[in-house]
Regions:
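Short, acidic/polar linear motifs in exposed loop/turn regions
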Residues: 166-168
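Surface-exposed acidic/polar loop and edge beta-strand patches at domain peripheries
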Residues: 1-152, 156-158, 170
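Histidine-centered catalytic micro-motifs
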Residues: 174-179
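A conserved active-site cap/scaffold subdomain adjacent to cofactor or substrate pockets
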Residues: 160-164, 173
Length: 179
C-alpha cells in the first residue's frame, strides 16, 4: 500500500492478513510494524504525529519526537538508542552527532519482497523481508536483514533480524526494539 495524504504521503508499506491477525510493515521505515490487529481489535499505539514518511524530522537531535509514530515496535540504533548526543574528536569512538533513537528506524528497506507458500507440514506461511543499510562515506556500513513471518490462522508473527558490519573498521553497535 502507499499512503496518499498528510504526513504519511508517499509512505510505502505491506499489509499482511493471516486470518486472525492483520499487520502493516512499513517498507520506507525499516520494515517496522506500525499497525497490528487481532480479530479486528487494534493492539498498537499511534503517537500524536501519526504516520510519517521519511522527512526532515528524522535525524537531527530531538527532532525524532516529530516523527516517532509508535506502532507494535520500531527499531532503534545502530549508533544510538537513547537521547541525542555528540561524540568529541579524538575519543575512542568516531566523532559525530547522533540523533535520538538513531537513524535505522527511518531507513527505507531495499530488496523488499513478500512471499506466501505452503510448507511440507501443511502450513501456509506469509513472509515479508528486506534489508536496511545505515552507512556513511568513510564511516559506518551496517546492514540489517529482516524477515517477518506469519503462519495462516496462527495468532503470532516472528521477526528475525541479522546485522552485519560491512565497514572497513570495527563499529560500535546499539540496538533496541521500542515497543
Amino acid at each position: 500500500i502507499e499512503y496518499q495524504e498528510g504526513r504519511a504521503h508517499g509512505l510505502k508499506a505491506i499489509e499482511v492478513k493471516n486470518g486472525p491477525l492483520r499487520f502493516v510493515s512499513m517498507a520506507d521505515r525499516a520494515l517496522d510494524v506500525c499497525q497490528f490487529e487481532y480479530r479486528g481489535e487494534n493492539l498498537t499505539f499511534l503517537s500524536k504525529p501519526g504516520l510519517n514518511g521519511r522527512n526532515q524530522f528524522d535525524t537531527n537531535g530531538l527532532e525524532a519526537q516529530r516523527s516517532i509514530m509508535g506502532g507494535l515496535f520500531f527499531t532503534c540504533g545502530f549508533e544510538n538508542i537513547c537521547a541525542p548526543y555528540v561524540t568529541p574528536e579524538g575519543g575512542k569512538y568516531p566523532a559525530g552527532s547522533f540523533p535520538m533513537h538513531g537513524r535505522i528506524r527511518t531507513t527505507p528497506a531495499e530488496h523488499v519482497s513478500s512471499d506466501a507458500h505452503w510448507t511440507a507440514e501443511g502450513d501456509y506461511v506469509l513472509e515479508v523481508s528486506g534489508e536496511m543499510r545505515e552507512a556513511e562515506l568513510f564511516g559506518e556500513n551496517l546492514v540489517m536483514r529482516r524477515k517477518i513471518t506469519s503462519v495462516y490462522g496462527q495468532p503470532s508473527i516472528t521477526v528475525e533480524d541479522e546485522v552485519t558490519n560491512e565497514s572497513f573498521r570495527d563499529e560500535p553497535l546499539m540496538w533496541m526494539y521500542h515497543c
